[in-house]
Amino acid sequence: MDTILLETEERMEKAVAALDREFGRLRTGRASTSLVDSIKVDYYGTPTPINQLASVAVPDSRTITIQPWDRGAFALVEKAIMQSDLGLTPINDGKIIRISMPPLTEERRKELVKVAKKYTEDAKVAVRNIRRDANEQIKKMEKDKAITEDDMKRGQDEVQKLTDAFVAKSEKVLAKKEKEIMEV
């Protein structure tokens, strides 16, 4: 039963970590290298992440700089950024690609908060699905007479505690991201 609980906790941790990654891709008013991590460049016929083709830096809170190692990749990187759904406009000076982050409008901020809430809801659903799987495993153990009914109840209580903790953690991550998005 301990292995089920450990496995459950590990899977729930991964669900919240995935939420964190999704939030990293959400654009706030602040520049972040994680914004361009999800952008793939068609480099010699292979979709390649920007951070594998160039050094990505944030010199100030409103600018991202991208310096491709291969001079031939400048146009490809620029094209990939423009085609992404992030609404970013790259400026290529031949040596470096700069992306200036325009301030977000109030309307756009509210849209981003809605998206963040959707991501959080998806993470909570994932956590609850993991709970269901764990409870099914525990019930199966009881049915196979590997554990007693009391142990089954105790195990299900532990799984519920884990679920509550990770749902609360998701809410905390959302509150932090919401504050960051609404910050002017």
UniProtKB/Swiss-Prot annotation:
GO MF, one example: ribosomal large subunit binding
Task: Tell me yes or no: is Cytoplasm among this UniProt entry's keywords.
Answer: yes
Q: What is its main location?
A: cytoplasm
- A Pfam family (short name) is RRF
* Domain of life, per lineage: Bacteria
Briefly state the protein's biological role: Responsible for the release of ribosomes from messenger RNA at the termination of protein biosynthesis. May increase the efficiency of translation by recycling ribosomes from one round of translation to another.
| Full protein name | Ribosome-recycling factor
Organism the protein comes from: Oleidesulfovibrio alaskensis (strain ATCC BAA-1058 / DSM 17464 / G20)
